[in-house]
Amino acid sequence: MAALEGPLAVLGERSSGDTVRNQNVTAAATIANIVKSSLGPVGLDKMLVDDIGDVTITNDGATILKLLEVEHPAAKVLCELAELQDKEVGDGTTSVVIIAAELLKNSDELVKQKIHPTSIIGGYRLACKEAVRYINENLIINTDELGRDCLINSAKTSMSSKIIGIDGDFFASMVVDAASAVKYTDQKGQARYPINSINVLKAHGRSQKESILVNGYALNCVVGSQGMTKRIVNAKIACLDFSLQKTKMKLGVQVVITDPEKLDQIRQRESDITKERIQKILATGANVILTTGGIDDMCLKYFVDAGAMAVRRVLKKDLKRIAKASGATVCSTLANLEGEESFEASMLGQAEEVVQERVCDDELILIKNTKARTSASIILRGANDFMCDEMERSIHDALCVVKRVLESKSVVPGGGAVEAALSIYLENYATSMGSREQLAIAEFARSLLIIPNTLAVNAAQDATDLVAKLRAFHNEAQVNPERKNLKWIGLDLINGKPRDNKQAGVFEPTLVKTKSLKFATEAAITILRIDDLIKLHPESKDDKGGCYEDAVRSGALEE
């Protein structure tokens, strides 16, 4: 072992076996400990200050881990795991990291008992597969029987640990209305909820309960000129990804003029090129022009004369969303394949009304009743920028949860109910296995209890007592068919006792639970498979050679 841990012929260090495994487990546990205290409805927030002094205050696991500058490769795996969970599901980022770290810790104990990592990996895969099957067969609640209340309760459960949890009813209703507003049916006839098309704007000032849901797409811009019309009915929208400014010749172009009068003609032609472009756009019937670039005063005059509304400096992501909602095509150039410039009427989008209104304290442009898809916008108010940013993250998580519930039409009880039920089931399942996987499945079952345990600790309750009571209820539910309704029992963290979370309305999307189990298991297995770490030294600029000499000195080339 000592020989292996010396310098290598490749200018690096190698460590293997138990050393690497211990390092990986420690790194994973460190990452999990950072986010552990932010789990649950009474979890605490983290303040992160980056290298230039920007402050972020958040409770969101994915945001915390994204802002950490982690060096250890095993810790990076967990940070990427939280990012993956956030991208795929949108919620459950903290719990997925905690479960993965606990699985690793317990697998390390098995390795120390001389059980081969391959046996543990096999057991973990089997346990994960059984756990997902058990959730789908026994623990899901169909949302059709619960209706809108189920959606609101799922959103409230997601918000409960966040800054907007205190006004959960208000924001949950707003989020459900926003998600329902953007519903459309795809080609297969299935309902889809593209929550990315919901624009979330932030304005600091006033209280968070003065946030509003706006019917239509709210654009944080104003018309280009005061003389323009502020309202257009039956709007035909042109989405342009270039500037409408006086054309100037590129640098390096040289024009030799013998007659001074020709200079004015060149200037006139520069103006005419842009004028012709605007006329081509207006000739198609366009009366609302949105562009990501600038529009100079000369061009604005043409739009004012034509009675059209022109908006400049629109963000590209907003332009793409508006194009999708209105049925427009984003145009990045007017040039066609023949080298001519043209603009087709088919590239225009349509909306019932485009109007500039004063919403809260700001002037916004609202695009209402778009033709291709409906759209909605949420305008958040808060005391300061930190609060508004955290509210936006919380709304994003809640929107993702509502989308998942609407699309999958199933939820599971929250508050540690699923983890406790799976723990009891997998312990019993492990005893039916005759192979070495039995120990790994039992450790998997024990690892899941970290979620109810952490929830209780964060709520300043007696974790040992609460988790023991919870396990007793779930054991009774699985052993005694007459009392199977006890499977909905989870933790009431405010009063510090178990309760029926189905009646209490504490719900989470089934997808959050199943995906987090799968992702956590795969991440733990990825790190568990590692038994060798070779770390190369960064190459210094002044030391070009030296590899061979270092290798001879270390004895790595001796037989």
Curated annotation (Swiss-Prot):
Catalytic activity: ATP + H2O = ADP + phosphate + H(+)
Binding-site residues for ADP, renumbered to this chain: G40, G92, T93, T94, S95, S161, K162, G415, E508
Binding annotation for Mg(2+): D91
Single GO MF annotation: ATP hydrolysis activity
Database matches in InterPro entries: Chap_CCT_alpha, Chaperone_TCP-1, Chaperonin_TCP-1_CS, Cpn60/GroEL/TCP-1, GroEL-like_apical_dom_sf, GROEL-like_equatorial_sf, TCP-1-like_intermed_sf, TCP-1_chaperonin
Binding sites annotated in the UniProt record for ATP: G40, G92, T93, T94
UniProt EC number: 3.6.1.-
Subunit field text: Component of the chaperonin-containing T-complex (TRiC), a hexadecamer composed of two identical back-to-back stacked rings enclosing a protein folding chamber. Each ring is made up of eight different subunits: TCP1/CCT1, CCT2, CCT3, CCT4, CCT5, CCT6A/CCT6, CCT7, CCT8.
Similarity-based family: Belongs to the TCP-1 chaperonin family.
Protein name: T-complex protein 1 subunit alpha
Source organism of the structure: Paleosuchus palpebrosus
